Amino acid sequence: MALGRTGAGAAVRARLALGLALASILSGPPAAACPTKCTCSAASVDCHGLGLRAVPRGIPRNAERLDLDRNNITRITKMDFAGLKNLRVLHLEDNQVSIIERGAFQDLKQLERLRLNKNKLQVLPELLFQSTPKLTRLDLSENQIQGIPRKAFRGVTGVKNLQLDNNHISCIEDGAFRALRDLEILTLNNNNISRILVTSFNHMPKIRTLRLHSNHLYCDCHLAWLSDWLRQRRTIGQFTLCMAPVHLRGFSVADVQKKEYVCPGPHSEAPACNANSLSCPSACSCSNNIVDCRGKGLTEIPANLPEGIVEIRLEQNSIKSIPAGAFTQYKKLKRIDISKNQISDIAPDAFQGLKSLTSLVLYGNKITEIPKGLFDGLVSLQLLLLNANKINCLRVNTFQDLQNLNLLSLYDNKLQTISKGLFVPLQSIQTLHLAQNPFVCDCHLKWLADYLQDNPIETSGARCSSPRRLANKRISQIKSKKFRCSGSEDYRNRFSSECFMDLVCPEKCRCEGTIVDCSNQKLARIPSHLPEYTTDLRLNDNDISVLEATGIFKKLPNLRKINLSNNRIKEVREGAFDGAAGVQELMLTGNQLETMHGRMFRGLSSLKTLMLRSNLISCVSNDTFAGLSSVRLLSLYDNRITTITPGAFTTLVSLSTINLLSNPFNCNCHMAWLGRWLRKRRIVSGNPRCQKPFFLKEIPIQDVAIQDFTCDGNEESSCQLSPRCPEQCTCVETVVRCSNRGLHALPKGMPKDVTELYLEGNHLTAVPKELSAFRQLTLIDLSNNSISMLTNHTFSNMSHLSTLILSYNRLRCIPVHAFNGLRSLRVLTLHGNDISSVPEGSFNDLTSLSHLALGTNPLHCDCSLRWLSEWVKAGYKEPGIARCSSPESMADRLLLTTPTHRFQCKGPVDINIVAKCNACLSSPCKNNGTCSQDPVEQYRCTCPYSYKGKDCTVPINTCVQNPCEHGGTCHLSENLRDGFSCSCPLGFEGQRCEINPDDCEDNDCENSATCVDGINNYACLCPPNYTGELCDEVIDYCVPEMNLCQHEAKCISLDKGFRCECVPGYSGKLCETNNDDCVAHKCRHGAQCVDEVNGYTCICPQGFSGLFCEHPPPMVLLQTSPCDQYECQNGAQCIVVQQEPTCRCPPGFAGPRCEKLITVNFVGKDSYVELASAKVRPQANISLQVATDKDNGILLYKGDNDPLALELYQGHVRLVYDSLSSPPTTVYSVETVNDGQFHSVELVMLNQTLNLVVDKGAPKSLGKLQKQPAVGSNSPLYLGGIPTSTGLSALRQGADRPLGGFHGCIHEVRINNELQDFKALPPQSLGVSPGCKSCTVCRHGLCRSVEKDSVVCECHPGWTGPLCDQEARDPCLGHSCRHGTCMATGDSYVCKCAEGYGGALCDQKNDSASACSAFKCHHGQCHISDRGEPYCLCQPGFSGHHCEQENPCMGEIVREAIRRQKDYASCATASKVPIMECRGGCGSQCCQPIRSKRRKYVFQCTDGSSFVEEVERHLECGCRACS
């Protein structure tokens, strides 16, 4: 498009965006979404070089090519490529992939090319490619693969190119390549191969390229076969050299003589190798079948361990779960140690099949429940350590297969009871540890006391925790009769054998039936133990801010409803609802959610109701509701949503109700799809409305025309991801620096995966609470701020934090639990603060601390700080810088070197030191003020009413502030709590005279009157027909003194008031109006009409007579006035002005003699006025005035190649210009013109621009157009409507086009300032009357002019009569049609006969067979018409009454634009192309093109692009043999 460089750019972008929106809507459902940051084109998805750490979600299912190369992906899981059944090419090269789960490629049935080179693969899992039968090229080069297992390539028989070079391969198992019968290229160079079995290449008949060079080939007798094999194939395997023995090193394998391939000693079989035995995880060490991974920071169980391992050590890592079958394949395992991790979830089959396992160590984790069957089959187990966990229940059959168990430790757990029979299978048990459990010693634990007395194997001293009478007593020493049950205890423990201990209601919650109500309890997180029977979980009105992925819902199989309304939820972590497959209703109303992602609702597969009302959501993206196919009701009411991404609701296939109200929708091009979706989907939506742009405000989205959803080119969708770095900071990978930025709070937009955060040199007064959400932090620098106090558990969530810098702040106090949870902290800097004391136990959790900086603090070294001195000396964690400041005897002594016995307490401690941790101890609040601690100001005083100031020391006169309301008088009173009292005026009461008592509580109002409260009184508001102070007096409006009816009207009393019946000639509520009967007078020859009651009189000019002055004078008198010979037209009156005749024109006419008709009234249904096109030039100015009270209609229409129209649309003026070379453009007036008053409308065409001006306001421009509008062509210009034969086919807009004509007045039409005369109206201008008098004759119909001064009425359905005032009678009632259907035609009807009958009443039977037998159709088929007459329906290419004439083969030229679809854009030729269509008959041949030529045409697309394509054009038609 050749457009201007300035303002036109925005217009072009708007048109292109609109075109794209139209194309996407018209083409059906929106295409699948593209993953974030990736680029999607047709069936290709490009995500290369984006720094991705995992395969992105949301890959389109129709993708055929996927580029994920040059990222940081480390693992390929089973779900990464699930469902991509059309994928043919997959690029994963140049990543960090070290693990590929088995089954990762199971859905890739069409995969042909796979690149995995330049990764970190060490092990190639067997059967990895068995589900990719069409794979032809596989690149595994430049990895760390150590061996090729026998089943590595099972199932990929079609592979032609396999690249394994530049790995660490030392073992190729026998038969590894057996399936590769079509292999042509195999690269094994640059590996560690020393031996190759003789059968390795036997099944490769098509091999043409083999690379074996740069290996460690040992040329002994076992490799002699390879020499013969290579000599027979000289073109492959070149440069394959021996590396051993020494005397053959460097020789070509093919050139060494067979006799030199010898083995020392007797010949034996080639030593076999095991590929799996070579694998060892990169972070671990492997030797003697023992894998040691201790303290390596692992977060999951390593995959691809050597198959023959007997022991694995995984203690002191960060593993959180043990997945299904984690150890199943390692059948020789004897010892597993996973102690001191973070394990909370164990799959039931994690240890399945380990029959050789003798030792299992799981202590020091977070296990709460042992899954059913976890230890089944472990028949050799002798040692099982489960101590230091959180186990609260054990099923009775937990240890059923552990007959050989010697030692079982359940020490330090949460067990309250143990089911009888739990230890029965333990036939070999020798030692049992049960201490440090909160045992409830009731009747259900009686068996344990008996068991321990009979089997003294419990050596840890297990004791009772409750009831109080048995508390702290050893279970083995209590007599069995002491174990008794109350009713509640019996209910609680009845089902403990099946782990139904959770029948106990969680603390702070209320349980009734299956409802667990934990609402309004100030909970910060979901309780960790909930009853398994829970169906309805109520957590509303709490303080929950983050929904963690704790797996809690996996333990609640019966859960159906979750209420989380009215919390503070800002984030829902991925996997938070895992296990909630049965939940049908989720309430998240009244929270602080700002963004949503598709993974936050994962697991809610059965959800039917989702309430997200009253949050802060600003955008709904197309993956937000992925997987929620069962949702029927979705509420997004009262959020901040401005845009919704196309396809956002596509996955909600069951949706029937959606509430989108009270959202600030911006109806730009990003929202175009929603209006169409709302119209197409018949669901309850609440009819959401636009709020922007201004001209669409409060208009329902589904009512907005598609072309009105526009963008100005600068707008972005609010669904775009916010920047991953705060605006005030700089970010490099996961390091964020916000130093010296003057910050008072933590900046927004902090990346969730931040590991190092620098906030030094700002104005922070406290440690930001938001830091607890960033759990990956390893370093925080908060130095040089103004932090004065820490709170307990400030850093408890930061388990990875290793460095914490708090130096040079204003810290005065360290709470005892301030550093709880910092078990990984190595460096703590508190240098340069105001700390005097550190409470004992403050550093209990700092088990990894190696450096403590406490220098430049005024330490008070008395006995309370002795512990710190000992602690520092024990590990030399403080470098000898911290010095004591007080007491005087310890001043300037080093904390590290001063002997411990010198830390003594002598006398009271200075109050200023003690008050550092509690400023209120110094009693700063005076005059009985209440002191409370403040983290910023140290303390805050709440003053009594008569004092103010920081310390409540400033007295105030309470009466000065006039606390008494409503004119009450204030009196000072020291005896009262507030220091004053009020004397209230009459009618008020209360301490401050703030209460106006309701005097209507006891009122005397009668006759259902309404009492209105006053001040110390009330008033009665009377119903109609009643009056009086108490509404007890009846009003008769029709008595003479009350009658308001005028002009002798009759007054009629009603229940509520009265009614006046007017005499003829008067109207109005009180008959006060004398009707103007002159409105439709018939006075002629300029007679004056004088209104009378119910009539009028014509005062005739001199010489005229008759009732209507219709009779002219009998003779022409001598001229006595200048008007005598001056003829005024159109009923105008001649008057003399300054001795000159002047015509006073009636409304609607102008000119010296009123000869021009300048105002017309459009009253008909299809009325219009046609103006000749010669009056319009290419550069023109068209102006007119309009008056109407209608919302829609056509004002002006010019139809040609580039049609334009001026229309009324919803009360505004709309200008539409449609050029085939670009999308239609539209502009609206700001002003509305449907108020019945005259408004000026002006259209200016100049220099390829179209401008609209309404009421002399600011012009609205369509901008620079591609070419000058072709308004100067020969097509006519229509006003007020268009002929029905023309229609609006030239315009390409949709169903919102106002096809109806204009109803109202058009006045003073000027074209290029030339006033147009409507007097010579063409014949078709019916329904157009001169002047601006509205037609009110037709009661139930439309007026249509038939002559200059008369109209006829076109009645609406159901009405008839000359004035459409008579209800129509159905003419088909009692019809006489015998064998047919009655069809109404106005006041009559006709009969539509059934087949085989004819006649006016369908009473004559036709013999169709005989009728057609005498009527021959040569090239067609005979049919019988409705009248019973035969006729011929001709075959193509024939015509005539009997189809006897063959049409000659001819070419017919049709001019139209050729269209193409390019991706998502619609493209068309820039101009119309002449196309020849061949039609006609050719006997036995066919009418076809016989001459054609190809020509290049430019196609312009709606996305702004263009291209050139050759198009074949037919030039001549003729008869040719049919093909």
From Swiss-Prot:
Parts forming coiled coils: none
Domain LRRCT: 215-265, 437-487, 663-713, 857-907
Residue ranges occupied by any CTCK domain in the UniProt entry: 1449-1523
Alphabetized Pfam families for the sequence: EGF, hEGF, Laminin_G_2, LRR_8, LRRCT, LRRNT
Disulfide bonds: 284-293, 441-464, 443-485, 505-511, 509-518, 667-690, 669-711, 920-931, 925-941, 943-952, 959-970, 964-982, 984-993, 1000-1011, 1005-1020, 1022-1031, 1038-1051, 1045-1060, 1062-1071, 1078-1089, 1083-1098, 1100-1109, 1123-1134, 1128-1143, 1145-1154, 1305-1332, 1355-1364, 1372-1382, 1377-1391, 1393-1402, 1412-1422, 1417-1432, 1434-1443, 1449-1487, 1467-1501, 1478-1517, 1482-1519
Domain EGF-like as annotated: residue spans: 918-953, 955-994, 996-1032, 1034-1072, 1074-1110, 1119-1155, 1340-1365, 1368-1403, 1408-1444
Keywords: Developmental protein, Differentiation, Disulfide bond, EGF-like domain, Glycoprotein, Leucine-rich repeat, Neurogenesis, Repeat, Secreted, Signal
Glycan-linked positions: 72, 192, 563, 622, 784, 792, 797, 928, 1025, 1181, 1247, 1406
Domain Laminin G-like: from-to ranges: 1158-1332
UniProt subcellular location: Secreted
GO cellular component terms given for this protein: extracellular space; plasma membrane
Transmembrane segments: none
Signal peptide: 1-33
GO biological process: animal organ morphogenesis; aortic valve morphogenesis; apoptotic process involved in luteolysis; atrioventricular valve morphogenesis; axon extension involved in axon guidance; axon guidance; cellular response to hormone stimulus; negative chemotaxis
UniProt LRR repeat ranges: 62-83, 86-107, 110-131, 134-155, 158-179, 182-203, 308-329, 332-353, 356-377, 380-401, 404-425, 533-554, 558-579, 582-603, 606-627, 630-651, 753-774, 776-797, 800-821, 824-845
One GO molecular-function entry: signaling receptor binding
PROSITE patterns: CTCK_1, CTCK_2, EGF_1, EGF_2, EGF_3, EGF_CA, LAM_G_DOMAIN, LRR
Residues covered by the LRRNT domain: 34-61, 271-307, 496-532, 716-752
Function: May act as molecular guidance cue in cellular migration, and function may be mediated by interaction with roundabout homolog receptors.
Name listed for the protein in its UniProt record: Slit homolog 3 protein
Source species of the chain: Mus musculus (Mouse)
